[in-house]
Regions:
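Hydrophobic transmembrane alpha-helices of multi-pass solute transporters/permeases
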Residues: 2-136, 144-547
Length: 547
C-alpha cells in the first residue's frame, strides 16, 4: 500500500503544469497545460463543426427541392416542413445545452449526438435509395403527393438527424472555448479568435454544401448526394476521435436555471426589506469564487442595475454576526443568494433585448433560405452550358461572409483597435447594430427584385408550370446584391453574439448561452410559416395573376 501511495504522488501533476481554470481530462484528472487544449484540440472540434454544418445545410437547404419535386408536396407544405424540422432541431439545443451545463460533460453530449446523427443519416439514405420509398416521377403542374408511409420514413430520418445536430451545435462551441485558459493572457488572446474561426469553418461548410452537394442532389441524384454526405460525416467523426486526448473539460456545476429561480424567489420573499446604502453589505462568499456547491464560479461585481433584485442578497438582522451555518440554511431555504447569483440573473435579463432584436436579422436570412431559393428556381440559371441548382445561389452569400471575416480579421481589425481601443475593434453591441442595418438593406433589395420578377411574369403572361420549369426571362444574377448584403450580416451578428454571451454569462451557463445564440435564428420559423401562407394555402411564389 505504501509503494502504491508513493507512485500516485510521483505521477500526480504538479500545480505549475495544471491549467489555471481547473480544467480536467476525460478521466477526471487535472489537464496538463503543455499537452492539452489551445488550437491543437480546437482543430479537431472544427472538424466536427465542418461535417455537422455541411450535412445539415446540404439536407435542409435543399429540402424544399426534394419535397416539391420528388415527394410532390405543394410548395407551402414543403416550406412548412423545412420550418418545422429546423425549428424543432434548434429549440432542442436549449435542452442539450442545459444538460451539458448542469449534469454531464459537453463531450458526452457530443458523442451521444453523433451516434444519433449517424442513425438519422442511415434512415435518410435508405429513404432516397430504396425504390418502394420513392414515389413515381411526375412532370405535371399538379402531381399526387407521396403516400403517408413514404413521407413518414423520410421525416423520421430528418427528425432524428436534426436532433443529433441539435446536441452537437451548442456543446461543441462551449467545449471549443474551454480549450483556452482565460486565466492565461496568451491563451485568452488566442481564445478570442475561436468564434471568428468557427464562423469561417461554418461558412466554408455552407459553401461546399450549397455548391458541390446541392449539385450532386439536383443533377446526379439524391441517392448519390445523401450517400456522399453520410460518408463525409462518418469520415469527419473518425478524424475527430484522434483529438480526444488533447481536450480539456470543465466539471458540470449544477442547474443554472435553479440559481435564477432562487434569486427570483429570494427577492420576492425579501421585498419588504430595505436595501443597504452600501452594496458591499450585500451577501457574498469570501474568496475569488462564488459558487455554493463547487466553488468554481468567478465572482461578479455588484452593479446598480435592476436594484430590486438585490433584495435577494439582503441579510436579515446583524449581517456581521450571523453564523455561517445560518447563512447556509437561508440559502438552502431559498431566502438568500450571493451577489454573484443576483448579477447572473441581471445579465440574463439585460441581454434579453439584444437576443430578441437579433431575430430581425434572421427574418431576412429565413427569406433567403426558402423564398429566395424558390424565387431563383423560376429564373434563368444558365452559366454557359451549365445550369446550376436553385439552392446553389446561396453560395454568393456564403462567399460574402468568408470575405468579410478575412477582411475584418486581417485588414480592418488593427486600425479599428487603435481607433476604438476595443480588443476586437468594434464592440459586440456595435457589430450587432451593423448586422441589423445590413439585414434591413437586404430586405429592401429583396423587395425590389420581387417587384421586378412579378412585372416580368405579368408582362410575358407566364403560367405556374412555366415558373416551375424555370422559364422566367430574368437572370438569377438579380438576387446577388441581397445575397452579398446578407453575407455581411451573419459574421457581424453571429460572432458578436457568441463573444458577448461567452463574456457575460457565468461558467455554469456556457453551453446554454451558446444554445441561445443558435435558437434565436429559428424563432423566425413560426413567423416565416405564417407569412408564407396565403388564404388559398400556397406560398407567394406562383405566377401572379394578370390584371
Amino acid at each position: 500500500m505504501g509503494s502504491m501511495r508513493i507512485k500516485a504522488e510521483e505521477t500526480e501533476l504538479p500545480p505549475e503544469k495544471r491549467v489555471g481554470d481547473g480544467s480536467i481530462s476525460l478521466r477526471g484528472k487535472p489537464s496538463d497545460k503543455s499537452k492539452s487544449g489551445t488550437w491543437r484540440a480546437a482543430s479537431f472540434l472544427y472538424v466536427i463543426v465542418f461535417v455537422n454544418s455541411l450535412v445539415l445545410v446540404a439536407i435542409q437547404g435543399n429540402l424544399i427541392t426534394y419535397t416539391v419535386n420528388i415527394l410532390h408536396l405543394d410548395l407551402a407544405t414543403g416550406a412548412n416542413l423545412t420550418n418545422y424540422i429546423a425549428g424543432s432541431s434548434m429549440v432542442a439545443t436549449i435542452i442539450f445545452g442545459f444538460i451539458a451545463d448542469a449534469y454531464i460533460l459537453p463531450f458526452w453530449v457530443i458523442a451521444a449526438s453523433c451516434i444519433v446523427y449517424a442513425g438519422g443519416l442511415i434512415g435518410l439514405v435508405l429513404s432516397v435509395s430504396l425504390p418502394h420509398l420513392i414515389p413515381p416521377q411526375c412532370d405535371e403542374a399538379v402531381c399526387p403527393p407521396a403516400s403517408q408511409h413514404i413521407q413518414s420514413v423520410f421525416m423520421a430520418g430528418l427528425f432524428i438527424s436534426g436532433m443529433g445536430a441539435a446536441g452537437i451545435k451548442p456543446t461543441v462551441l462551449s467545449l471549443g472555448r474551454q480549450q483556452f485558459d482565460d486565466t492565461d493572457p496568451v491563451e485568452k488572446k488566442k481564445g478570442i479568435l475561436f468564434f471568428s474561426y468557427y464562423y469561417a469553418v461554418y461558412e466554408a461548410a455552407l459553401f461546399l454544401a450549397t455548391t458541390v452537394f446541392f449539385w450532386l442532389q439536383t443533377d446526379v441524384g439524391f441517392k448519390e448526394g445523401y450517400s456522399t454526405m453520410a460518408g463525409t460525416f462518418y469520415a469527419g467523426i473518425i478524424i475527430s476521435l484522434f483529438g480526444i486526448r488533447y481536450l480539456r473539460h470543465q466539471k458540470p456545476v449544477g442547474s443554472p436555471l435553479t440559481i435564477l429561480a432562487k434569486v427570483i424567489v429570494a427577492a420576492t420573499r425579501n421585498w419588504r426589506k430595505p436595501l443597504p446604502a452600501d452594496g458591499s453589505d450585500l451577501y457574498e462568499l469570501e474568496g475569488e469564487t462564488s459558487d455554493i456547491q463547487l466553488n468554481r464560479i468567478r465572482k461578479i461585481t455588484h452593479s446598480e442595475r435592476l436594484k430590486f433584485l438585490d433584495k435577494a442578497a439582503v441579510l436579515p438582522g446583524d449581517a456581521k454576526g450571523l453564523p455561517s451555518d445560518k447563512k447556509q440554511q437561508l440559502i438552502r431555504e431559498w431566502k438568500l443568494c450571493t451577489v454573484t447569483q443576483v448579477e447572473v440573473l441581471k445579465v440574463v435579463l439585460l441581454l434579453f433585448p439584444n437576443w430578441l432584436c437579433s431575430c430581425f436579422m434572421y427574418v431576412a436570412a429565413a427569406q433567403n433560405v426558402t423564398f429566395g431559393v424558390q424565387q431563383v428556381s423560376g429564373m434563368n440559371r444558365q452559366l454557359g452550358d451549365f445550369t446550376f441548382p436553385p439552392a446553389t445561389v446561396m453560395s454568393a452569400s456564403i462567399f460574402s461572409s468568408l470575405l468579410w471575416i478575412a477582411v475584418y480579421e486581417y485588414v480592418l481589425l488593427r486600425p479599428l483597435k487603435k481607433w476604438t481601443g476595443h480588443p476586437r475593434g468594434l464592440s459586440p453591441q456595435v457589430r450587432t447594430g451593423l448586422g441589423l442595418f445590413f439585414a434591413a438593406a437586404t430586405m429592401g433589395a429583396s423587395a425590389l427584385v420581387e417587384m421586378r420578377r412579378v412585372s416580368v411574369i405579368r408582362a410575358h403572361n407566364i403560367t405556374d408550370l412555366q415558373v416551375k420549369r424555370g422559364l422566367i426571362p430574368m437572370s438569377a444574377a438579380w438576387v446577388l446584391p441581397e445575397l452579398i448584403l446578407m453575407g455581411f450580416c451573419h459574421p457581424l451578428l453571429g460572432t458578436a453574439m457568441l463573444e458577448l454571451y461567452h463574456q457575460e454569462f457565468p461558467e455554469n451557463m456556457v453551453s446554454l448561452s451558446m444554445a441561445l445564440t443558435l435558437v434565436v435564428r429559428h424563432l423566425v420559423d413560426l413567423s416565416r410559416l405564417v407569412l408564407s401562407m396565403q388564404p388559398n394555402g400556397s406560398l407567394v411564389m406562383a405566377a401572379p395573376k394578370a390584371g
